[in-house]
Structures are given as C-alpha cells and as structure tokens.
Design a protein with these regions (language model features):
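Flexible, glycine-/charge-rich segments associated with ATP-binding catalytic modules
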Residues: 1-16, 115-133
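Glycine-rich/acidic phosphate-handling loop/turn and adjacent ATP-lid/helix
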Residues: 82-106
C-alpha cells in the first residue's frame, strides 16, 4: 500500500496559548492527511505532534503567550520527521527514570512520543521525532 502521495514540508510557529495551539495543530494535521493516507501512521503523528507542541508551550514556555513554539515537519517517501522547538532553556531528558507506577501528572508524554518514534532526540529545547513509513 502506498502511504505517501508526495513529499511535504511544513514550517510554522504558534504562540503558547493552548486554545490557539489546538486549532493550529488541527490545521497542520489536515494538511498532513492529504499526504499520509495510512490511518495508523496518522494516529501516531497526531499524538506525537499534540504531545510535543503542548509540552513546548507548557513546560518550555510556561504558557507565556509572548513565547512561541516552532514546528518543522518533513515527509518523504520513507519517513516523517517532526521537530518542535520552544523558547525555554531546555532540559535533560532521562526516559529510563520514568516509573509508570508513580502516578505523576506529567512525564508520560515524552515516554509515549519516544515509544511511537523510530528515532527520538532531545537537544536542549528542541525535540525531534522520526517515524519510518
């Protein structure tokens, strides 16, 4: 089954307001739906994108509407690359220390994104997820 019709690139920025982010991400997903036809891949991409953009606004930018989250997406024949950068100071990511039995209110998002990604990188305030198609 062909997953991709054509290659696709997106580069956009959104302020750290979760209501605005919701509409912004929906618009990006509508554009991706025209390129990626596999529903299970789109489900993963939707979850990855929602988690990363929300994390950037909440944890990186502390909900500051004057700070922005940048999203870069590149879709090619065999992969989709999602890069999300916020204006925060960055953090050290240690997914191995996550304990699913510790019922914290945060911390699961990056574990989920890492699990859905074939490649996952954190560099200060930039997170990259690569999913092979």
């Amino acid at each position: 089954m062909d997953v991709i019709i054509l290659s696709f690139k997106f580069d956009g920025t959104v302020c750290s307001d979760l209501h605005i982010i919701k509409d912004f991400v929906e618009d990006v997903l509508d554009k991706l739906n025209k390129v990626i036809k596999d529903e299970s891949v789109m489900f993963d991409v939707k979850l990855i994108l929602n988690e990363l953009v929300a994390n950037g606004a909440i944890h990186g930018n502390s909900y500051d509407r004057n700070k922005y989250v940048n999203i870069f997406i590149n879709v090619e024949d065999d992969f989709i690359r999602i890069e999300v950068t916020d204006e925060g100071n960055g953090f050290k990511c240690d997914l191995k220390s996550y304990d699913p039995l510790n019922l914290k209110c945060s911390g699961r998002g990056l574990v989920i994104v890492s699990g859905l990604s074939d490649e996952f990188y954190v560099e200060k305030n930039k997170i990259t997820s690569v999913k092979y198609l």
